From Swiss-Prot:
Name of the protein described by the UniProt record: NAD(P)H-quinone oxidoreductase subunit 2 A, chloroplastic
Keywords: Chloroplast, Membrane, NAD, NADP, Plastid, Plastoquinone, Quinone, Thylakoid, Translocase, Transmembrane, Transmembrane helix, Transport
Biological-process GO terms, alphabetical: ATP synthesis coupled electron transport; photosynthesis, light reaction
NCBIfam families in the cross-refs: NDH_I_N (TIGR01770), PRK02504.1 (NF002701)
Transmembrane segments: 24-44, 59-79, 99-119, 124-144, 149-169, 183-203, 229-249, 295-315, 323-343, 347-367, 395-415, 418-438, 484-504
One Pfam short name: Proton_antipo_M
Gene: ndhB1
GO cellular component terms given for this protein: chloroplast thylakoid membrane
Family: Belongs to the complex I subunit 2 family.
Catalytic activity: a plastoquinone + NADH + (n+1) H(+)(in) = a plastoquinol + NAD(+) + n H(+)(out); a plastoquinone + NADPH + (n+1) H(+)(in) = a plastoquinol + NADP(+) + n H(+)(out)
Membrane topology according to the record: Multi-pass membrane protein
Location of the protein in the cell: Plastid, Chloroplast thylakoid membrane
Species of origin: Amborella trichopoda
Phylogenetic classification of the source organism: Eukaryota, Viridiplantae, Streptophyta, Embryophyta, Tracheophyta
Length: 510
């Protein structure tokens, strides 16, 4: 009898929870329509995978790419709508969040064509790969709109778990297993530290979890200058630091870049930076509004260490992927300048603009590695010598992306850095901008060294790897070239017409 009553209560409670969830989705579903498109794409992928054979593999790419493009389209149609808070205050929709969601979707859309040849050469399970990519994208999108501490923790964990699985996707590769282990351990440690900071923030604000309510709670409890807030700031900075991977929280980055499959590295190198930057802007700018001087100082230290260590260590690298890992550490130092400046002096606008250019420059560079690596079996920088003689398009496209990463005029990277540094200078960050300028010059050296190898070879000799280099089959080659063309155009032409891009970025402030 008791069991029967308990069973009835369980059914009633489950029914109430389901009806509440259905009610929320019915009346608030339009606020997450782009995310719903991705969820539908995930379900469709699972259904087709369970009922199809290997001949339907092209459909998997088509469904994934189409769902991403449709999600981007839904975001564009929602542009300039009034900011809204939905799902009982857990999710916020505004232009500032949507621009980060757009960047994450753009990264994923460009990464899928890059992965076609690699998946076919290594015979990776295509469905699981695409499912993890779409789920990670979904987690990043929810993170951009997260408005409370619980969602801010769950969304990046969704992204991180998929990242761990993707980095260890080639289970037979010892380096991939090692990279996954380091990534998982450090990611778990950073998440626990982040939650520790959230607990201090929650307690100091009187039990509030929504970001704006936390600010009001700190005012009511007079705890905004308490030691607890300092502990929360330090813990959250460390937690976000592992996501952004600035120095000294960069230890996992080179190993994960070197050991993970190249398309996975290309995906993580941009999406993780965009998602973590969106998290940093919301966390530091709202709950820690009264501690702006403290978190400015912390981020300045991280930016200086990242720009110096990242660019100096990149010079000594012999692996192309490890070099790009340290290059990304230096690049995140430039992005942090925009976070410090904030919405005053167009800091966020310059950060968003530079991040858009960084996506195209970085993915364009990784397109070369995805093309060259599986066909030659090497990742050594010296083995790229003389690539221009066998594949001029790939070599020239890579050279343009590398020059743009270094900030050579008139490419997009130059104007992106120029505007970012100018905003930092106007905000009084003279020392930080000076370090950025000097380290940018250092980065040009190792980028030009690679370009010289690509064009002329080492001692004007072509390596055996390049000599045996063969172009890939038509379909996979076209998919990589498509992404490469988009990345090259985005790395060059937008630099000439910066004003419209800056204006759009300025229109996103919350």
């Amino acid at each position: 009898m008791i069991w029967h009553v308990q069973n009835e209560n369980f059914i009633l409670d489950s029914t109430r929870i389901f009806m509440k969830a259905f009610h929320l989705l019915l009346f608030h579903g339009s606020f997450i329509f782009p995310e719903c498109i991705l969820i539908f794409g995930l379900i469709l992928l699972l259904m087709i995978d369970s009922t199809s054979d290997q001949k339907d593999r092209p459909w998997f790419y088509f469904i994934s790419s189409t769902s991403l493009v449709m999600s981007i389209t839904a975001l564009l149609f929602r542009w300039r709508e009034e900011p809204m808070i939905s799902f009982s205050g857990n999710f916020q929709t505004n232009n500032f969040n949507e621009i980060f969601q757009f960047l994450i979707l753009l990264c994923s859309t460009l990464c899928i064509p890059l992965s076609v040849e690699y998946i076919e050469c290594t015979e990776m399970a295509i469905t699981e790969f695409l499912l993890f990519v779409l789920t990670a994208t979904l987690g990043g999108m929810f993170l951009c709109g997260a408005n409370d501490l619980i969602t801010i923790f769950v969304a990046p964990e969704c992204f991180s778990l998929c990242s761990y699985l993707l980095s260890g996707y080639t289970k037979r590769d010892v380096r991939s297993n090692e990279a996954t282990t380091k990534y998982l351990l450090m990611g778990g440690a950073s998440s626990s530290i982040l939650v520790h900071g959230f607990s201090w923030l929650y307690g100091s604000s009187g039990g509030e979890i929504e970001l704006q309510e936390i600010v009001n709670g700190l005012i009511n409890t007079q705890m905004y200058n308490s030691p607890g807030i300092s502990i929360a700031l330090l813990s959250i900075t460390v937690g976000i630091g592992f996501k952004l991977s600035p120095a000294p929280f960069h230890q996992w980055t080179p190993d994960v870049y070197e050991g993970s499959p190249t398309p996975v590295v290309a995906f993580l190198s941009v999406t993780s930076k965009v998602a973590a930057s969106a998290l940093a802007t919301r966390i530091f700018d709202i709950p820690f509004y009264f501690s702006s001087n403290e978190w400015h100082l912390l981020l300045e230290i991280l930016a200086i260490l990242s720009m110096i260590l990242g660019n100096l260590i990149a010079i000594t690298q012999t692996s192309m992927k490890r070099m790009l890992a340290y290059s990304s550490i230096g690049q995140i130092g430039y992005v942090i300048i925009g976070i410090i400046v904030g919405d005053s002096n167009d800091g966020y606008a310059s950060m968003i603009t530079y991040m858009l250019f960084y996506i195209s420059m970085n993915l364009g560079t990784f397109a070369r590695i995805v093309s060259f690596g599986p066909r030659t079996g090497t990742d050594n920088i010296r083995d790229y010598a003389g690539l221009y003689t066998k594949d001029p398009f790939l070599a020239l496209s890579s050279a343009l992306c590398l020059l743009s990463l270094g900030g050579i005029p008139p490419l997009a990277g130059f104007f992106g850095k120029l505007h970012l540094f100018w905003c930092g200078w106007q905000a009084g960050l003279y020392f930080l901008v000076s370090i950025g300028l000097l380290t940018s010059v250092v980065s040009i050296y190792y980028y030009l060294k690679i370009i010289k190898l690509l064009m002329t070879g080492r001692n004007k000799e072509i390596t055996p790897h390049v000599r045996n280099y063969r172009r890939s089959p038509l379909r996979s080659n076209n998919s990589i070239e498509l992404s490469m063309i988009v990345c090259v155009i985005a790395s060059t032409i937008p630099g000439i017409s910066m004003n419209p891009i800056i204006a759009i970025a300025q229109d996103t402030f919350f």
